[in-house]
UniProtKB/Swiss-Prot annotation:
Segments for region (Disordered): 147-170
Active site: 11, 89
Classification via SMART domains: PGAM (SM00855)
Full protein name: Probable fructose-2,6-bisphosphatase TIGAR A
Family label: Belongs to the phosphoglycerate mutase family.
Lineage: Eukaryota, Metazoa, Chordata, Craniata, Vertebrata
Function: Fructose-bisphosphatase hydrolyzing fructose-2,6-bisphosphate as well as fructose-1,6-bisphosphate. Acts as a negative regulator of glycolysis by lowering intracellular levels of fructose-2,6-bisphosphate in a p53/TP53-dependent manner, resulting in the pentose phosphate pathway (PPP) activation and NADPH production. Contributes to the generation of reduced glutathione to cause a decrease in intracellular reactive oxygen species (ROS) content, correlating with its ability to protect cells from oxidative or metabolic stress-induced cell death. May play a role in mitophagy inhibition.
Feature type site, description Transition state stabilizer: 186
Cell location: Cytoplasm; Nucleus; Mitochondrion
Reaction(s) catalysed (UniProt annotation): beta-D-fructose 2,6-bisphosphate + H2O = beta-D-fructose 6-phosphate + phosphate
Gene Ontology biological-process entries: apoptotic process; autophagy; negative regulation of glycolytic process; regulation of pentose-phosphate shunt
GO cellular component: cytoplasm; cytosol; mitochondrial outer membrane; mitochondrion; nucleus
GO molecular function terms listed in the Swiss-Prot or TrEMBL record: fructose-2,6-bisphosphate 2-phosphatase activity
Matches recorded under InterPro entries: His_Pase_superF_clade-1, His_PPase_superfam, PG/BPGM_mutase_AS, Phosphoglycerate_Mutase
Organism: Danio rerio (Zebrafish)
Length: 256
């Protein structure tokens, strides 16, 4: 068994975010001044949290956010940032570059909830889930290869098994976990990933979490954290357990 922490962070604000425009995959924006400030604040919040691996979407807004967070960290500033195209934002097809409110109106006209609506030429939720599965498989393999010395025999793991609500600290859930991956990605992609974790993988909902928050769009530089346990053998690596510590945390905004 190999237990590791997984902290997922949405990129900082871009001008398109501020203007209410859909970026998707065609608009590869850099961070706005506010987005840089948000990323610096996220980096300061996580500065004493040890990461052993960093994965990032290869879109500019995510890479810039990851670089700022890692630069502020006291233990992982020299880690390789592994750029993975499986982490890029959901494609919104012909709606990209247009206003978010216009896509909401398109979904309403089609009689569908916004998260489930697919604009022409866009990606369906199921297509994004396939990319999520591809990324998880690659991440599991990379972590197992990088941390073979942390694999334990039997059904126990070094993860914190506490069922108490998180204390609101930056290292909640990962203080006793020697392997910890940082992933920096995108809002719609993260929302679908949460659906996959909670609905498909049956991850328990954290105590005290408002169910309406489960699948809401994470704010810019908002954070989600999970503890994942892998079953490792000479022929296979498989998910054994997943627990959620928190989702959509934005405590570092207080420092802005």
């Amino acid at each position: 068994m190999l237990a590791f922490g997984l902290t997922v962070v949405r990129h900082g604000e871009t001008q398109c975010n501020k203007d209410g425009l859909l970026q998707g995959q065609k608009i590869d924006s850099l961070l706005s001044d506010i987005g840089i400030q948000q990323s610096e604040a996220a980096g300061q919040y996580l500065r004493d949290v040890k990461f052993t691996n960093v994965f990032v979407s290869n879109m500019k807004r995510a890479k810039q956010t990851a670089e700022i967070i890692v630069r502020n960290n006291r233990t992982c500033h020299d880690l390789e940032l592994v750029a993975d195209p499986s982490l890029i934002e959901r494609s919104f097809g012909i709606a990209e570059g247009g206003r978010v409110i216009d896509m909401k109106n398109m979904a309403k006209a089609a009689g569908q909830p916004l998260p489930e609506f697919t604009p022409p030429e866009g990606e369906t939720m199921e297509q994004v889930k396939l990319r999520i599965k591809d990324f998880l498989k690659a991440m599991y393999q990379r972590i197992a290869n990088d941390h073979q010395d942390k694999v334990q025999d039997g059904g126990t793991s070094s993860a914190d098994e506490s069922t108490e609500a998180p204390a609101g600290l930056a290292n909640d859930g990962v203080s006793s976990v020697p392997v910890h991956a940082l992933v920096v990605g995108h809002g719609a992609y993260m929302s679908i990933a949460m659906r996959y974790f909670f609905e498909d993988l049956k991850c328990p909902v954290p105590r005290g979490l408002d169910p309406a928050q489960q699948f809401s769009i994470c704010p810019n530089t908002g954070m989600c954290r999970f503890i994942i346990t892998l079953k490792c053998s000479s022929v296979d690596i498989a998910l054994s357990d997943i627990k959620c510590v928190f989702i959509n945390r934005r405590d570092h905004f207080k420092t802005n």
